[in-house]
Curated annotation (Swiss-Prot):
Protein name: LPS-assembly protein LptD
Short name of one Pfam family: LptD
UniProt-listed InterPro entries: LipoPS_assembly_LptD, LptD, LptD_C, OstA-like_N
Subunit-level organization: Component of the lipopolysaccharide transport and assembly complex. Interacts with LptE and LptA.
Record field: transmembrane: none
Role this protein plays: Together with LptE, is involved in the assembly of lipopolysaccharide (LPS) at the surface of the outer membrane.
Keyword Cytoplasm: no
Homology family: Belongs to the LptD family.
Organism: Mannheimia succiniciproducens (strain KCTC 0769BP / MBEL55E)
GO cellular component, one term: transporter complex
Domain of life: Bacteria
PANTHER family: LPS-ASSEMBLY PROTEIN, LPS-ASSEMBLY PROTEIN LPTD
Gene designation: lptD
Subcellular location: Cell outer membrane
Amino acid sequence: MKKNYYSLISFSIFTALYSTAGFADLQQQCLAGVPQFSGEVVKGNANEMPVYIEADKAELNHPTKGVYQGNVDIKQGNRHLITETAEIIQSGQDENVQRYAYAKGGFDYKDNIINLTGDDAKVHLNTKDTDVKNADYQFVGRQGRGSAQSAEVREDYRLLNNATFTSCLPNDNSWQIEAKEMKQYIKEEYAEMWHARFKVAGVPVFYTPYLQLPIGDRRRSGLLIPSAGSSSRDGYWYSQPIYWNIAPNYDATFTPKYMTHRGWQMNGEFRYLNEIGEGKIAGEYLGDDRYKDYIGDNKSRHLFYWAHNAKLFDNWRLNVNYTKVSDKRYFSDFDSDYGSSTDGYATQTARLAYFQPNYNFAISAKQYQVFDEVSVGPYKALPQIDFNYYQNDLAQGLLDFKLFAQAVRFENDSTLMPTAWRYHAEPSLNLPMSNQYGSLNVETKLYATHYEQRKGSSARAEDIDRSVNRMIPQIKVDLQTVLASDKTFVDGFTQTLEPHLQYLYRPYRDQSNIGSKRNTEYLGYGYDSALLQQDYFSLFRDRRYSGLDRIASANQFTLGGTTRFYDEQANERFNLSLGQILYLNDSRIDNNSDHSTSGRASSWALESNWKLSDQWNWRGSYQYDTRLNETSLANTTLEYNPEKNNLIQLNYRYASQAYIDQNLTSGANRYNQDIKQIGTTIAWEVSDNWVLVGRYYHDIALNKLVEEYAGIKYNTCCWSVGVGARRHLVSKSNYTYSANKDTIYDNSFGITFELRGLGNEQHSGIVDMLDKGMLPYVKPFNL
């Protein structure tokens, strides 16, 4: 049944793409349906401004009474009242004088905030307090209208009896709130309602003795729109956000969520902004996970998240990015705004930095919570101290000097792994030269590193050299030039040729005595090094490994180049980059041949972008392994994007098993074969109201679905409803998650409902739909 339903949604998306209906800005359409204030807004105290009255007939009994009849038109500042009969009554004398105006036989009142019509009105001219009967009201410049049997209009609020409210445009009562009493606060932009009934198409669906509702853009505490759905993991679920506007610079959202398969999950988020910084603190907690297929020891599932950015004084900065979950399966089992299973790890960092024009330093703490099933995780850097110094224009402007220094202490949760202090200094001297033909940069650098190491505390821990010194000099020569010509094989275009030549030399140093030698469960090298991914731009990097513990030898030339095509408006429409490293000697880090380059050349690397038209974009990258005579890595993306949020994207990814094995240590590759994945994303604002999003990813090598999603959303000016169906891979059979040895999928269905028009912002919701999922939409083009 689920598959048939899903196919129906997919078919709807496919056929809707061929709709001839164009998309118009929904917000502009909605604003066109509400009254706008005509003329220039008059500033100042309206009560002190003169009153102008026009009428067909006037009877004056000065100073106590005046009667105006026939097409009565009264203006004062931004206020404008039209009625058939108006009476002005004055009583008292001097400071105690009281003036009242009575509109009879129907009236029409307008100002820059509200339009009001009714049968009769009484206006206290001293205070402008107004009482009306059988009134209809419409906000000016924003959505919101209704009626009231009687209304008291005051400077700061409107008190309505037997009243209604809706944000729908005139002649549309898709939803409406009826209340025995309603108080609308003008400056605070919210309404209180007592004995409120929520109606949909005239049918009562909800009653509450008290309700608060925003009627503007200001934040207000209260219930937000809930969401509900079902999932094979969670069962039926219901989520109810509760918003608390603590202060102008503090707010919080609490979201209880009930899942029939798992129980209650309590979620909360606190946001703050003060003189020293801004940030967000969030938590998710499920006390007892009742899901029958979850076999983890810890039934209490939780998440903590903290992001903070602060400016301390003029030159100090503090940054915190901390995410911690109860178990490795958390992001696979729960959809969260604070992480994803595709990330592979949760970051836990804090950094305090000081900046000056030519130097800066920072002290930080860094660790990662890895979700892979590994017995030895990454190292923690507790603490890490970095220092950078820059001095340009030395030797009469010929040389640039830079110094990077670092001290860091490494710890590991595994008692088998060693701990260490690492002290590193990296001075460099650059001789940059450039003219209209190109640039030449000669750089010399020295890597000076000292380690103080201790073996792991376990009796099975391997012995390790306690003190290690490493000194590696480096020289790099980088030459670039740009050649341009308007004589190309494509008429109307200017072509550039940009050759890029680099020579890099760094002598070999055996670094096998840095960190663990034998533990194959550790996924890195040393303490913080890992083999970097390769592409065209990586050909010109100094190092093959991240971190500082593995600095490979180098005696190599990098040959590369880029060609670009520009149209007559100087817009870049196409580029192609191609390059390769030529090794004069193997690049090594130790005596293990698996860690060295083999052959005299690296893979060919290619990158290309092509803007075929204003609507069509293509991007591709390709690597060819000359040693194995096979493709090692490839990906391509083609996108049709005729309008802002309308797009169709096709993509393909490939990585050979040899490439994966080269970049990951033993046991890290769970596929044990090539990776071949195809995918497509479709998003279309079919008309003024309909939004469709579809996504499909399939692993060809495994012949397994990765993710498929279809969502439909219908928007009007005052409400929207969205439904979505999703099926995605939760885990593979070698995960210790379930006794079921087959691949595990989660099938889910969700529905969202939203009241719109309560503020000025209108949007289709298509961006939010694209951001969800295992593989959210990415626009990879740079043309």
